[in-house]
Amino acid sequence: MFFPSRDIVERVRKEYPAGTRVELVRMDDFHAPPIGTKGTVRGVDDTASIMVAWDNGSSLNVVYGEDKCRKITEE
């Protein structure tokens, strides 16, 4: 299992602070929200996974190095 360095974790935390709006681009999970689902970042854990409260009620994390989301600059 790959664990990102402390520097990577801190970089992701700065890039995706709590409250940031994101859109799902890719998630490798059977229960993943549909691509394009929007949500609000709740935080970043110690493995650099982005914890998201998805607008559809899901709470699956965006796993660092596996899944992908993008910041929403305006809605």
Tell me the role of every PLM-derived stretch:
Residues 2-75:
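Basic/aromatic-rich interaction segments and small domains that mediate binding to polyanionic partners
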